[in-house]
């Protein structure tokens, strides 16, 4: 049950892979592995090619081969320590490997090179939340929303933090803003309705469920929400 919500890393991968990443992902792992094998063969003849190493790292990430991706990105940043794509990728990969301090350093170095960069600020805020640097995380996401007040992604990220922390009324507001800014994303509505049901705001929750049905979500996929509403007094 997912709408076409923006996903920063996926968009970056698509750019690096020349628009072929999504199509190959739909074909399955075999196509991805074939592309990775080809990239590896070509790299043998051009070991200092940063572009090829970034593309190979992108395939590794698509296949969730985090250690292989990190090795490639280390080589990219050895060749060019200020490579923006390399820092962004490696921060993501380090986070997947639970190397949180290294990921944080990559994001911070990225922000030195591109101050105010949306992706880096968002990544750093979410990393801080995951690593229990809660004050830094919330300060970071608040700052991001001040800089990018029209970003549905930023509001949804803050809503997710607030939901995890039990700040439910604030989370309802932020997911509502995300829905207002991006009316195509089912995930925002799903989180919003979940919060409304928890808070006992039944009328608004039913409005959200009707909205999801209008967006093409089948009634059967919403049964759990309807059941929770029926149990609410």
Predicted regions, residues:
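N-terminal leader/linker segments that initiate helical-solenoid repeat arrays
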Residues: 21-71
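Canonical positions in the second alpha-helix
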Residues: 41-42, 75-76, 109-110, 143-144, ...
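Terminal, low-structured helical/coil segments at or just beyond the last alpha-helical repeat
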Residues: 30-34, 198-233
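Position-specific recognition of the canonical hydrophobic site in helix A of tetratricopeptide repeat
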Residues: 61, 88-95, 129, 156, ...
């Amino acid at each position: 049950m997912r709408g076409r919500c923006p996903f920063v890393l996926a968009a970056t991968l698509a750019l690096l892979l020349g628009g072929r990443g999504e199509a190959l992902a739909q074909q399955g792992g075999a196509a991805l592995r074939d592309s990775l094998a080809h990239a590896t063969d070509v790299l043998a003849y051009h070991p200092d090619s940063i572009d090829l190493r970034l593309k190979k790292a992108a395939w590794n990430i698509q296949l969730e081969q985090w250690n292989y991706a990190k090795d490639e990105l280390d080589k990219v940043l050895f060749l060019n320590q200020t490579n923006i794509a390399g820092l962004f990728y490696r921060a993501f990969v380090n986070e997947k490997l639970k190397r949180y301090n290294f990921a944080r350093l990559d994001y911070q170095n990225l922000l030195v090179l591109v101050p105010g960069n949306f992706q880096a600020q968002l990544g750093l805020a979410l990393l801080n939340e995951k690593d229990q640097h809660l004050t830094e995380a919330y300060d970071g996401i608040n700052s991001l929303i001040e800089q990018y007040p029209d970003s549905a992604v930023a509001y949804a990220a803050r809503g997710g933090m607030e939901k995890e922390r039990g700040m439910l009324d604030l989370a309802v507001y932020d997911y509502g803003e995300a829905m207002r800014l991006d009316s195509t994303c089912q995930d925002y509505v799903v989180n919003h309705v979940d919060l409304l049901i928890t808070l006992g705001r039944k009328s608004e929750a039913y409005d959200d469920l009707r909205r999801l049905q209008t967006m093409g979500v089948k009634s059967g996929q919403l049964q759990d929400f309807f059941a929770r509403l029926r149990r609410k007094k």
